[in-house]
Every structure is written in structure tokens, then in C-alpha cells.
């Protein structure tokens, strides 16, 4: 019998097993029959290239010298970073075009929009209508470039971000693209943003849904109930153990954003 729910979303191409956010990671994740979708992180360089890279700088993931590794990615050109490889691998920091080309069209893609380096960007929700318009305007140049690449493929695309401005800009640029607010512990804000942007999903952290014993919290139950009533999915991040996967499946989540397919037991 085939597996139905929860779906398994390969976090950065299964970061625990592969050099994260690289072309090789995409190929490995896509070749695993447990994978339903792949999550990747999009960033801007100083010369307006869209790369796939998680961190603000290169210090954690590359052996770049301090003059480069301590500089924010958005202040570096693609030529300045393209020669460095991820971790102990030979995999370079890829362009979004390269990563998407490595993922089969049949595989879903969760594109997380990271901070593009513009000043005045508010993390999380924005207070009022005027501020939301301004936030969307600040995000728009980067979002347009990322979506120009992503929507040129046939992938089932879901755009997520911790920044409301990114969601607003996505809605303005491509109204038909599915979006999902990423939230930390403020799940109520996640519900508000999901309603505001008619989101297809909400992406909360595990500890916003489960207590230390693995039992669904009252806030988690409420979030799941509201989301499912509105026909929205809940995709939880970041799953690192089979115990977490089982508890989240019992809670009724729709997707597991996982660092390895090995953490997803067959009985979920």
C-alpha cells in the first residue's frame, strides 16, 4: 500500500545526509522514493543573481577566508562566491536555475525566500497596510527575479518566508503561486498571515505543535483545526528523529520538513 500522509519534504535536500542546498543534494533527495517535495533557500547576490544558500554569510558552510566569509552574501557578487564549495564536498554554491534543473518536474519545490539584503525589512508580520505596501516594494526586485526562474519550470511550487513582505510581494508578482508563512513560536500570527494571503499552508516549528513529551499542545491543536477547516496544510519543521515524525503524524500534520528520509518511519 502506498504512503499518503504526511508528505516528506527534503529540508535543503536532506541536510543531514548531503551537502545542503547543492545540485548533488537535489539529485540525491529526488532519487529517494520517500521524498514528495524538496525545500530550498533562495538568496540574492550583489550582482542580482539568485543563488540557493541558507546562511547570511559563508562562514559555517565554506572554507572561504574571513574577508569573504564574514561578509553578508548580498554584498558579494556571484563570481566572488562561486569558487567555494559546501562543507567537505566538491559542490559549489549553485544558482537557482541549476538547482531547479536538477529536480524532476514531478517533484514539488518549496522555495524559501531569505533576506535579500535590503534595509528596513521586518521579520514576521507587518503592522499596518501602508507598512505592508512598503515592505512588498522592498522585496519586489528580488522576488521578481526568483519567481521568473521558478515559474519557468513545471514544478508544483510553494513559496515560503518568515517575512510578510516576501509573501506580499509574491502575491503581487504571481497571484497564482501558492504561499506559506513560516513562523516561529507565534502560531497565531501564522494563522493571520495565512488568511491575509490565502496561503496554501503554514510552516510552524515542531515545538509550536508538540510539548516535550510529544503530545500536541492546545495551541497546536487550534492551529491544526483552523488550518484544516480553511483547507490549508500544516508542514512542520525541522524533523530530525523518528519519534518526532510519529508524534507529528499522530497530531495530524500534513508535511514533515525533514533533514533525512531516515527519520521518517514506515508506519507514518
Describe these PLM feature segments.
Residues 13, 43-45, 56, 114-116, ...:
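Active-site beta-loop-alpha junctions enriched in small/polar residues
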Residues 54-173:
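Metal-dependent phosphodiesterase/phospholipase catalytic core, i.e.
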Residues 1-9, 31, 65-68, 77, ...:
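Haloarchaeal acidic low-complexity proteome signature biased toward cell-envelope/secretome components but also
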Residues 4-9, 152-156, 170-181, 220-237:
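Short beta-strand/loop segments at the ligand-binding rim of alpha/beta enzyme cores
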Residues 32-35, 102, 197, 251:
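Structural motif
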Amino acid at each position: 500500500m502506498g504512503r499518503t500522509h504526511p508528505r516528506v519534504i527534503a529540508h535543503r535536500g536532506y541536510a543531514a545526509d548531503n551537502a545542503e542546498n547543492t545540485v548533488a543534494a537535489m539529485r540525491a533527495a529526488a532519487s529517494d522514493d520517500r521524498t514528495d517535495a524538496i525545500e530550498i533557500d533562495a538568496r540574492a547576490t550583489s550582482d542580482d543573481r539568485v543563488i540557493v544558500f541558507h546562511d547570511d554569510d559563508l562562514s559555517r558552510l565554506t572554507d572561504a577566508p574571513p574577508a569573504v566569509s564574514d561578509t553578508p552574501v548580498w554584498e558579494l557578487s556571484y563570481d566572488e562566491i562561486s569558487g567555494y564549495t559546501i562543507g567537505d564536498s566538491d559542490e559549489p554554491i549553485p544558482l537557482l536555475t541549476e538547482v531547479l534543473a536538477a529536480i524532476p518536474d514531478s517533484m514539488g519545490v518549496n522555495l524559501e525566500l531569505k533576506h535579500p539584503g535590503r534595509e528596513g525589512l521586518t521579520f514576521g508580520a507587518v503592522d499596518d497596510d501602508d507598512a505592508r505596501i512598503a515592505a512588498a516594494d522592498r522585496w519586489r526586485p528580488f522576488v521578481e527575479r526568483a519567481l521568473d526562474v521558478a515559474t519557468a519550470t513545471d514544478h508544483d511550487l510553494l513559496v515560503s518566508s518568515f517575512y510578510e513582505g516576501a509573501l506580499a510581494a509574491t502575491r503581487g508578482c504571481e497571484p497564482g503561486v501558492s504561499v506559506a508563512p513560516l513562523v516561529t513560536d507565534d502560531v497565531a500570527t501564522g494563522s493571520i498571515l495565512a488568511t491575509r494571503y490565502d496561503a496554501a499552508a503554514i510552516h510552524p516549528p515542531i515545538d509550536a505543535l508538540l510539548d516535550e513529551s510529544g503530545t500536541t499542545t492546545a495551541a497546536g491543536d487550534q492551529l491544526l483545526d483552523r488550518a484544516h477547516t480553511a483547507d490549508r496544510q500544516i508542514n512542520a519543521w525541522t524533523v530530525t528523529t523518528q519519534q518526532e515524525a510519529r508524534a507529528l503524524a499522530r497530531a495530524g500534520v500534513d508535511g514533515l520538513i525533514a533533514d533525512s528520509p531516515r527519520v521518517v518511519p514506515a508506519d507514518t
